[in-house]
């Protein structure tokens, strides 16, 4: 985790990547969802699919 002074809290590395990519290009709609996989982050849907796979 990295402490982010302006936000006043610590970010997990994944959250930091999402946070900074969001602010890098605020005019692009859907930028976060399209770039999340490039950072190796899982969407909520992907996490649910993974959990369902592990239960079987």
Swiss-Prot record:
Pfam families referenced in this protein's UniProt entry, alphabetically: YrzK
InterPro entries attached to this UniProt entry: YrzK-like (IPR035378)
UniProt name for this protein: Uncharacterized protein YrzK
Gene for this chain: yrzK
